[in-house]
């Protein structure tokens, strides 16, 4: 299949909600080695976000069941083995994406917004790995995630408008990283609030094309801030993340 056929197949897979097929098509497009267009970049991101999202959701449910079966050895063992199976799938998907990012996507990215998009993606997928990791492996994935987010953050601050949806999406996910992974609510709130305030101050720079995306992410930033600063917040806060 040539590139245009692979992209067409990815779009068809998306409409059929067959995200594993969509990811396989976009992986093949990426491995052709050319820089991806914005449309191709978004197709790749949506495909893997859905593929990994299904496993993250399953992992959380099974982990919760596993904890509730304490005292019932047989049921707990079954839950543990099933969690480990899902964990392996999740890790394989993340390693797949990180391989594409390191080999093709980050090195080939020319415009700053592409570089930020892919470095944010790198931060995201190391974050997903860290959610299921433990010990030295957890520390390594946390460090790699923070480094990727930080590099993306610095480029976005110097090269992109505060209202740019990719810059806002990065701030959203980086703040979730601080809150959930590093357990630093103050840093998470500070980052989210700065991103929101800077975007509000420059709302007049919003172009029509990205208005909807930018305002949606600003709302998510505000929702997280409200959640994080409320005194009655539960332990299992369901924090909003950027889709792309």
UniProtKB/Swiss-Prot annotation:
SUPFAM superfamilies cross-referenced by the UniProt entry: 14-3-3 protein
Cystine pairings recorded for this chain: none
One Gene Ontology cellular component: cytoplasm
Subcellular location: Cytoplasm
Site (Interaction with phosphoserine on interacting protein): 56, 127
Entry-annotated residues carrying N-acetylmethionine: 1
Pfam families: 14-3-3 (PF00244)
InterPro entries: 14-3-3 (IPR000308), 14-3-3_CS (IPR023409), 14-3-3_dom_sf (IPR036815), 14-3-3_domain (IPR023410)
Transmembrane segments: none
GO biological process terms held by the UniProt record: axis elongation; gastrulation with mouth forming second
Keyword Cell wall biogenesis/degradation among record annotations: no
Keyword set, alphabetical order: Acetylation, Cytoplasm
Subunit: Homodimer, and heterodimer with other family members.
Family: Belongs to the 14-3-3 family.
Its job: Adapter protein implicated in the regulation of a large spectrum of both general and specialized signaling pathways. Binds to a large number of partners, usually by recognition of a phosphoserine or phosphothreonine motif. Binding generally results in the modulation of the activity of the binding partner.
The protein's name in its UniProt record: 14-3-3 protein beta/alpha
Species annotation: Xenopus tropicalis (Western clawed frog)
Gene that produces this protein: ywhab
């Amino acid at each position: 299949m040539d590139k245009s056929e692979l992209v067409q197949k990815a779009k068809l897979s998306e409409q059929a909600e067959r995200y594993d097929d969509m990811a396989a098509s976009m992986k093949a497009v990426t491995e052709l080695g050319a820089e991806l267009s914005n449309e191709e970049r978004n197709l790749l991101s949506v495909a893997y976000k859905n593929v990994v999202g299904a496993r993250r959701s399953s992992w959380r449910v099974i982990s919760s069941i596993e904890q509730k079966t304490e005292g019932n050895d047989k049921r707990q063992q079954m839950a543990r083995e099933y969690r480990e199976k899902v964990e392996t799938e999740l890790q394989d998907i993340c390693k797949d994406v990180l391989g594409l990012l390191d080999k093709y996507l980050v090195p080939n990215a020319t415009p700053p917004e592409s570089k930020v998009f892919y470095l944010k993606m790198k931060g995201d997928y190391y974050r997903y790995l860290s959610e299921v990791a433990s010990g030295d492996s957890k520390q390594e994935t946390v460090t790699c995630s923070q480094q990727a987010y930080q590099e993306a953050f610095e480029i976005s601050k110097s090269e992109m408008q505060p209202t740019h949806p990719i810059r806002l999406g990065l701030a959203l996910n980086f703040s979730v990283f601080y809150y959930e992974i590093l357990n630093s609510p103050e840093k998470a709130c500070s980052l989210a609030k700065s991103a929101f305030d800077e975007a509000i101050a420059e709302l007049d720079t919003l172009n029509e094309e990205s208005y909807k995306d930018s305002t949606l992410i600003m709302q998510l930033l505000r929702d997280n801030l409200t959640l994080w600063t409320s005194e009655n917040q539960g332990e299992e806060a369901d924090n909003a993340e950027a889709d792309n």
